[in-house]
Amino acid sequence: MIYQGETLSVSYLENGIAELRFDAPGSVNKLDRATLLSLSEAIAALQQQADLKGLILTSGKDAFIVGADITEFLELFDLPQEDLLGWLKKANDIFSAIEDLPVPTLSAIKGHALGGGCETILSTDFRLADTSAKIGLPETKLGIMPGFGGTVRLPRVIGADNALEWITTGKDYRADDALKVGAIDAVVAPDALHSAAVQMMKDAIAGKLNWQSRRAAKKAPLRLSKLEAMMSFSTAAGMVAAVAGKHYPAPMTAVKTVEAAAGMSRDEALVVEAQGFIKLAKTDVAKALVGIFLNDQHIKALAKKAAKQAAKATRHAAVLGAGIMGGGIAYQSASKGIPAVMKDINEKALALGMGEATKLLNGQLEKGRIDGIKMGQVLSAITPTLSYDNVKHVDLVVEAVVENPKVKAAVLGEVEGIIGDDAVLASNTSTIPISLLAKGLKRPQNFCGMHFFNPVHRMPLVEIIRGEQTSDETINRVVAYAAAMGKSPVVVNDCPGFFVNRVLFPYFFGFNKLVADGADFAAVDKVMEKEFGWPMGPAYLLDVVGIDTGHHAGDVMAQGFPARMSKEGRTAIDVMYDASRFGQKNGKGFYAYEQDKKGKPKKVADVAAYELLAPIAKPKQDFDKEAIIAGMMIPMINEVVLCLEEGIVATPAEADIALVYGLGFPPFRGGVFRYLDTIGLDRYVAMADQYADLGPLYRVSDRLREMAAQGKTFY
């Protein structure tokens, strides 16, 4: 044994070939600070080995190294700039020391080698992967960029164009795709990885593979002419500007870093990379995106805990109500290995549901994500039926019929009499209180809400709603089922609109108010999209969701919270609804819709919408972006805070994940609570107070005012 640490060890295999094996105590290998220290000590020990002829990096886990330890990031980002630079330099000295060993080096890669894991393998001369390998640099998704030499070594290994695509998109690549661009040198079967790595190393030691020239290229300036450099970097910058936009600085900073370091040696280029990394690490965007990752991990941990505590796992499920939504839920369940019965009273609805599942699977097939066998397996795991016979023995039923309390109550009561006493019932409802639906049930403890978002296959959030009598066992089983479906379940307590819709409608209230005061709805959309960062502005969102749906939900919210959410006369949404302008579904809403070349709806301005709104609005006036953002966001933020105070949602982390995953709250802002911490509670309260005369939704709670006065934060 040359070296033994807690997370890695070094020992000789044969003939002077040493193996550095990453094998942390947990389920995965991470490059945390402790592992970096061990790696430094291990390389120092190797440097003293007179008999060393070659080094192979391996992993004792299913994955090579999944990346740096992101739980350490926020603490690191808060370090003074000099200390952060010192940490980066020490880390990079380790990878440079691997690269500078006087013997050939090779990485034997299985599973994920991401982020710091990818940068580790780039420090070796050769990279051999098995078919399970996935390689990539996802740092830009966290608002930062590679900091352990990724922007320096990858362009010198696979060329500037390929490297810029890898770094700016943050995608991970399968072994065969990585092989095509030269990121790895060969791909072998998993059971051949070790023997192939040893043989490859023997060939390098024998001089059959020129490891010295490989290494020299990585340490030298990029081989690009002035014209090639100009074309590569200007093209990359243009694409990044179009895709990432101004709110996500990491991809553009990465492009500029690679460009600035193109003519430099390795050591000079690493200094430039460190400067870019630190610049990004100090941004609010990085803290927000890392915060989302950590919140997501928190949600996953809660779901794992629920699965452990559940007395029974869901092996068979049923969906009541087919169509697009029911078909989407059945598909999601079946695609994750949980067979689903899809029951409806209408043959056409069943055909629509199966059609939806088939369409989604065809999309996966065309992208090469599944093969025909997998498609057949998933489709055969969905059983469409007009009768309850196949529903009798399922573990869990998701009711997904029309959003009508009477219809839902009737269906729930009917199916409860058919399923087993320990089977769980869940209602996919967006606004109807769960405790109301539970009133007609004999086993209300086995019932909860399970609110999916449309489209089901794409939206990660599922709201799990606890009714007054819902048992912990029911919640645990439904949370575990949602997680098994690949979703992010957030448990909320029962109230009109639950959490997501309850906080969305104050936002629409703000929209109605702005339009009534003379704002141009298209200008409001533009500000909320381009400046605040929502994927869609409020008018466009209403058109996409359906103005009839929004109108109905708005009435439910007004009844549920009359003191705050009752209407002040006819609203912009009322006007569109009364004119039967329901949005994309019938081609006219706030905008008119035409089909683009792909047959998808494309919005265009429509004078008729403005004419309809004129009687309920003051004369048109321009609002600056600050006034529009304040008018839209203060009602939502205040309602989110109230939901936390009332215990509707348990933690700021769960609230922020629900907002980002369920509503598309701008990820670079991290969610409402991260946003409040970023701008400062005192500053927010002062801003909201300027709008307090607009109504109850604009008035901050006493608790929030108290927190602001005490200088507190939510995280």
From Swiss-Prot:
One of its GO terms (cellular component) is fatty acid beta-oxidation multienzyme complex. The active site is at 451 (for 3-hydroxyacyl-coa dehydrogenase activity). Its EC number is 4.2.1.17, 5.1.2.3, 5.3.3.8, 1.1.1.35. One of its GO terms (molecular function) is NAD+ binding. Residues 1-189 are annotated as: Enoyl-CoA hydratase/isomerase. Keywords: Fatty acid metabolism, Isomerase, Lipid degradation, Lipid metabolism, Lyase, Multifunctional enzyme, NAD, Oxidoreductase. GO terms for biological process: fatty acid beta-oxidation. It comes from the Bacteria. In the N-terminal section; belongs to the enoyl-CoA hydratase/isomerase family. The record marks 119, 139 as: Important for catalytic activity. The keyword Lipid biosynthesis does not apply. Pathway: Lipid metabolism; fatty acid beta-oxidation. Heterotetramer of two alpha chains (FadB) and two beta chains (FadA). This is Fatty acid oxidation complex subunit alpha. InterPro entries: 3-OHacyl-CoA_DH_CS, 3-OHacyl-CoA_DH_NAD-bd, 3HC_DH_C, 6-PGluconate_DH-like_C_sf, ClpP/crotonase-like_dom_sf, Enoyl-CoA_hydra/iso, FA_oxidation_alpha_subunit, FadB. NAD(+) binds at residues 325, 344, 401-403, 408, 430, 454. Substrate binds at residues 296, 501, 661. It catalyses: a (3S)-3-hydroxyacyl-CoA + NAD(+) = a 3-oxoacyl-CoA + NADH + H(+); a (3S)-3-hydroxyacyl-CoA = a (2E)-enoyl-CoA + H2O; a 4-saturated-(3S)-3-hydroxyacyl-CoA = a (3E)-enoyl-CoA + H2O; (3S)-3-hydroxybutanoyl-CoA = (3R)-3-hydroxybutanoyl-CoA. The keyword Lipid metabolism applies. Pfam families: 3HCDH (PF00725), 3HCDH_N (PF02737), ECH_1 (PF00378). The lineage of its organism: Bacteria, Pseudomonadati, Pseudomonadota, Gammaproteobacteria, Aeromonadales.
